[in-house]
């Protein structure tokens, strides 16, 4: 997971350096699709377990998914700032820390510790049902 984040960030930065926004977005798309597959596989595997083992596996799947979502959000922030800032708001994290490239490769536990909190104790804001962080452009209606 960390290697995938590092590769995505490097490819994204190379594309942005060359002003290849379409390529940068493709990097984000590929990274998010792979992250979604990792989440799907990990959550399905956790659901097949029972008791404490199931809880531990699902917790790890969520922790990993948060890390990958945070990395993707940092990458996309300059392109779709409003939606990315809304993600940050619902994670209930200081935007300066959340969007800092200094934290991009930190695990969820490392990131939470850098905020002065204990891993596993940070609370996020509840999402309303069927919530979308990225609103449609007026031309899409």
Regions from the PLM with identified roles:
Residues 1-24:
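Long, amphipathic alpha-helical stalk/connector segments used for oligomerization, subunit docking
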Residues 29-141:
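Basic, alpha-helical terminal appendages of large translation-related enzymes
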């Amino acid at each position: 997971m960390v290697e995938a984040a590092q590769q995505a960030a490097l490819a994204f930065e190379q594309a942005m350096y060359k002003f290849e926004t379409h390529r940068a977005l493709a990097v984000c798309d590929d990274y998010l699709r792979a992250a979604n597959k990792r989440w799907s596989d990990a959550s399905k595997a956790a659901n097949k377990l029972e008791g404490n083992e199931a809880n531990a596996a699902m917790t790890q799947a969520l922790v990993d998914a948060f890390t990958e979502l945070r990395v993707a959000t940092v990458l996309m922030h300059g392109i779709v700032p409003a939606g990315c800032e809304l993600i940050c708001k619902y994670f209930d994290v200081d935007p300066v820390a959340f969007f800092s490239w200094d934290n991009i490769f930190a695990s969820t536990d490392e990131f939470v510790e850098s905020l002065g909190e204990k891993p596993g104790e940070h609370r996020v804001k509840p999402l309303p049902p069927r919530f979308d962080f990225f609103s449609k452009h007026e031309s899409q209606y």
